[in-house]
Amino acid sequence: MQILQNIYDFVKGKIDIKFYESVQGITGKENDFTVITDKDEYHCSNAVVAAGRSGSKWISEICDNFGIKRRSNRVDIGVRVEIPAAVFEHITSKVYESKIVYRTKKYGDLVRTFCMNPYGEVVTENTNGIITVNGHSYADPALRTENTNFALLVSNTFSEPFKDSNAYGESIARLSNMLGGGVLVQRFGDLVAGRRTNEHRFGQTFLNPTLKATPGDLSLVIPKRQLDDIIEMIYALDKIAPGMANIDTLLYGVEVKFYNSRVDVDENLETAVKGLYVLGDGSGVTHSLSQASASGVFAARTISEKFN
């Protein structure tokens, strides 16, 4: 929040910021656009679309309306893992957010760790009405927990004729919501034993969970291939972090990372429609907060040069 406040304080005297106003659509032609909101219409010669991952569907509609080409992209499906912080402490004490990538022997798929949160909490996330799982940690030592959490994600890239990778991820997340009323949680030991984690088994875990979730069976939600990949990855991680494959390791599901179809933009992040820019994670070009932020700065500099 402090970072956002600092940004707001810096720009508030230089630009107009509209709060509580939703953009409905963009119409127009090259260097002549109308941005339509639920309250007003704004005219401009340059329009920047940066709606994030959650706005990927809307960005696709904008691109289709303007005839801007898109390429099919991927969706990442997996779980949020929660373990005692001591298991990964020898890694997180040196690399706060380690990025570990593993290619499975069974399928040759890539599985990666993502969003490492030492001494953090598992949380829920609402994306277009679908409840998925995420995680965070606090800068304040007083708010630390005894656990570390991170995502294990399997990347899925589809070929013809299937094009809607986001719909694939949404369907899996909706199934989890249907079975558990939200987020499901399962002990790793129960998963590999082929049994559901019920309230009794969940109550026997030595780990103190940081999220209230519904004990269940992730094998009824996540497709076999992705689940096999995740299990293999956990055993691989156990070799560098003993205790990872413990029976009480908690797996929360599902975690889904949506990516927009990669929008056809040039080196300046400008589409074939002159004056219309698409950037950030919603463009399918960037895949992180830092990259998305950098793309915004880059586009702003590019546009400002037009007026110099």
Give a label for each model feature.
Residues 1-308:
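Residues forming the flavin
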